[in-house]
Amino acid sequence: MVSDLRSRDIAAGGHGAPLASTLDALWLAGPNRRAALNIGGIANITVVGRPGEPVIAYDTGPGNCLLDTVATRARDSAPRHHPAGAPGYDVDGTLAAAGQVDLALPGILLAEPYYAAEPPKSTGRELFTAGYLDAALAERASHPGGAELIPAHADIAATLVELTARTVGAACTRHGITEVVGAGGGMRNPVLVAALRAALDPVPLRRSDELGIPVDAKEAYLTALLGALSWHGLPGVLPGATGSRTPRVLGRFSPGHGPLRMPTPASPVHTLRITEASAARLGTPCTT
């Protein structure tokens, strides 16, 4: 078993994230500049340039984490309208679809210094917490007339969708992207996907399914790939993506009952081809 995949990257000066850039760089390698977008709790992109160009990867900001907070609050504030065990996320974007974007709130949220920081960079739920959202709402309420215009849960959800779409769109525009391939739970939110398409226009947004990786399975493919690379003595991190000074073989191996016998290090991998057979095995990619 291989585990602890981030530590060696951090020891080399990297952020330990986003490790998905390794998969993205092999998967989307080609003549055009494309971006892999993953929307989990945090949204991140990997910019895969033309041959010879460095790979750039970083977290753009909140993905679903703040939306989940608002959806949970909406559920808990109206229990009669939500059955017991209702999920703490915006199912099919229905909450955001019922709201309107608050015009004052995005500017307050975007005052967080992380957005203006240069990549490589990474963030997480420890920054984009409920407290971050509540502080922005409190600041909005302090504006003239703000206390009388407190946004409803649906309006906050719609505004957070706009925040994610705007920050992702700005990042892709900055890097001259010609196509975006999206994965992660956020790609199952039709309201968020529509907002992303509008923010990215005229750059097309495709689902990762179209290129062989189910939107909900990308992390499984990534873990399988990183494990295979480490097993064969190959680096699993791109310095330009995480900030690491040098490429590093990732993780530590825990042997079973017998001694651990590692294979001879393999030749470098340059591309990744997803086959139907590998998809059926839930993430055993074919590398070339």
Regions found by a protein language model. Give the residues of each.
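Glycine-rich phosphate-binding/hydrolytic loop that grips phosphoryl groups
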Residues: 162, 209-260
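Phosphate-binding/catalytic loop of phosphoryl-transfer enzymes
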Residues: 2-73, 80-81
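Glycine-rich phosphate-binding loops at beta-strand->alpha-helix junctions
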Residues: 177-199
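Non-transmembrane, aqueous-exposed alpha-helical and coiled segments at domain scale
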Residues: 105, 156, 160, 171, ...
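Short helix-capping/linker segments at secondary-structure and domain boundaries
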Residues: 28-34, 74-86, 173-175, 228-238
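Conserved ATP-utilizing enzyme core subdomain
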Residues: 56-165, 169, 177, 246-268
